[in-house]
Design a protein with these regions (language model features):
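Alpha-helical support elements that line or immediately flank enzyme active sites
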Residues: 26-29, 40, 105-135, 166-182, ...
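Non-catalytic C-terminal accessory modules of carbohydrate-active enzymes
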Residues: 264-265, 347-507
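Extracellular/oxidizing-compartment recognition motifs
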Residues: 1-97, 105-106, 122-125, 138, ...
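Surface-exposed acidic, glycine/proline-enriched linker/cap segments
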Residues: 76, 80, 219-229, 376-391
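Repeat-solenoid scaffold signature
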Residues: 321-367
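Extended, well-ordered alpha-helical scaffold segments
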Residues: 75-78, 120-131, 179-197, 250-275, ...
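The feature captures the catalytic groove of carbohydrate-active enzymes
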Residues: 4, 10-13, 19, 92-94, ...
Length: 507
């Protein structure tokens, strides 16, 4: 068994038999995350004598995805299993080693995916209550909630991790339409933004201090998970911009106009400072890495359209130069495909998604993974385990790309909080013949399915009662607005030219 990644966790149950009578071992005060187990001391033990019991919070399944690509479907299934294995009373980072903690960064990164797949509202609202309770008087957010570490490092403000205070409530509002989530969390959100704005000072740049940065990007050495290519100051200032925008919007929605204006101005100042300090007039971003372009594009940190388009082209060039291999860590991974899509680089996004060589989303699948790994190479191509300390085999953060599968590959996304309005915008590729997603929204089941066959694209959309949808049919000049019910389109296959040209996804 590969137990080294467990670190100090023994992950061992010892049972002393009382006598010859039949006994059942089922520990009730612990749980173990594992794929393989070893049993000793039981003669004539058969596989059928052992029953594996899945432990997790009993969350209602609300989201599904499928496609014609077997590896892609297995990736999505791995995301589902990592969600099940880590949402146990609270959103943990991993279920097996000597942590099993509610890491804030992991939770906010994975939030959009988790809230599509399962009804996590109750669990995450409870966790946010704990976050607010654990928040320090100065507004700093501990790195794990509940804060079992309680040391000076764990309460040092860290970008992306502490920003769970703003991003998770905003994600829940977007998925449920429930303003009470924002109302309850607004003091916590405000305290966090005020704290990091103070750290940034009058120049509005969050510089220095402790940062995780783009945690565990592929260039980080096994012994140095902090060793990402991206300048942590870029990551930190980008998150100050994001959180101040969320706070301003939340205050506006709740009718706190003066507060909304205050944080709107802060957001404008941070965005201007980011552009001045980190972006060239031609659209190059400091560190010149996939993650910084993903952040700048996805979070609207580039003041001019020509910079945005140049950044998209540069991001695509970096992906090509890497052989269509991923080069992002925890921070950039949820955003990189969106950034490529938003700047007209959909073909590059698909080639990145469907890459099977290491590092990539599908590489672990080719190695037999059944959950999402903490590192892109938790297992090396030769079958050896990465020697680094951070080598979990069930860690959902890098699976955040599933949100892009739902919204872009299948094409199902909320256009208004709580799915009161849907945007259906499937973006097919020649590499897939079909894709589908469905979600149990507050209004009922919404679904999208498309299939390419015989030179045609067949699109089926189901809109629940009480909701509407804006449908972007591939090849059509304008979207169509539809009400509840099932709607079908049969149009020319937009990928037919790619197929005739012999399109493929090379490694």
């Amino acid at each position: 068994l590969g137990t080294r990644p467990l670190r100090t966790a023994k992950a061992t149950d010892t049972w002393v038999l009382a006598g010859p009578a039949e006994e059942v071992l089922e520990p009730s005060l612990t749980l173990h995350g594992f794929r393989y187990a070893e049993v000793r001391g039981v003669p004539d033990l058969r596989a059928e004598d052992i029953e594996l019991v899945v432990v997790g919070t009993d969350l209602r399944r609300t989201g599904w995805f499928s496609s014609s690509h077997a590896l892609l479907d297995q990736l999505h299934e791995n995301v589902v299993w990592s969600t099940r294995g880590n949402f146990v009373d609270l959103p943990t980072d991993c279920p097996q080693r000597d942590e099993r903690l509610g890491w804030t960064g992991d939770t906010q990164i994975f939030g959009p995916t988790a809230t599509f797949l399962y009804d996590t509202t109750g669990l995450l609202c409870s966790w946010l209550t704990d976050l607010a309770a654990e928040q320090l008087p100065d507004g700093a957010v501990p790195h794990v909630i509940p804060d079992v570490n309680r040391n000076s490092l764990s309460s040092t403000p860290a970008a992306a991790w502490g920003d769970a205070a703003t991003i998770v409530p905003w994600t829940l509002y977007q998925r449920t339409g429930d303003l009470e989530v924002l109302e309850r969390q607004l003091p916590s959100m405000r305290a966090w933004v005020d704290r990091i704005a103070t750290l940034a000072g009058p120049d509005r740049l969050w510089i220095g201090g402790f940062q995780y940065g783009d945690w565990l990007d592929p260039t980080a050495p096994p012994e140095d998970p902090f060793g990402a290519k991206v300048d942590p100051d870029v990551v930190a200032t980008a998150h100050l911009a994001r959180s101040s925008w969320i706070l301003a919007e939340s205050a506006r929605l709740l009718g706190h106009d003066d507060e909304a204006e205050k944080y709107r101005i802060l957001n404008q100042e941070v965005r201007a400072a980011f552009a001045h300090a980190f972006v060239t007039p031609a659209g190059r971003v400091l560190s010149d890495a996939q993650t910084v372009y993903a952040l700048a594009i996805a979070w609207d940190l580039l003041p001019h359209e020509h910079q945005r388009q140049a950044a998209g082209r540069r991001l695509a060039d970096l992906v090509r130069a890497a052989g269509f291999r991923i080069a992002t860590g925890f921070v950039g991974t949820p955003l990189v495909c969106d950034a490529l899509t938003a700047t007209g680089q959909l073909d590059v996004a698909y080639r990145l998604l469907l890459q099977t060589q290491c590092p990539s989303w599908l590489y672990p699948v080719t190695m037999g993974a059944t959950t999402i790994w903490e590192r892109w190479d938790s297992m090396r191509p030769d079958g050896s385990i990465n020697p680094g300390e951070m080598t979990s085999f069930n860690h959902y953060a890098l699976g955040a790309v599933a949100d892009w599968l739902h919204r872009t590959v299948a094409g199902l996304a909320p256009a208004a909080p709580g799915y009161r309005a849907l945007v259906v915008r499937p973006q097919p590729t020649a590499e897939l013949t079909r894709a589908a997603a469905r979600h149990l929204s507050p209004y009922g089941e919404a679904s999208v399915a498309w299939e390419r066959a015989d030179g045609r694209l067949h699109l089926t959309v189901h809109v629940p009662v009480g909701a509407t949808a804006e449908v972007y049919v591939p090849g059509s000049p304008a979207p169509e607005r539809v009400g509840h019910g099932e709607h079908r389109w049969d149009v020319p296959d937009p990928c037919a030219a790619q197929v005739l040209a012999g399109s493929s996804i090379p490694n």
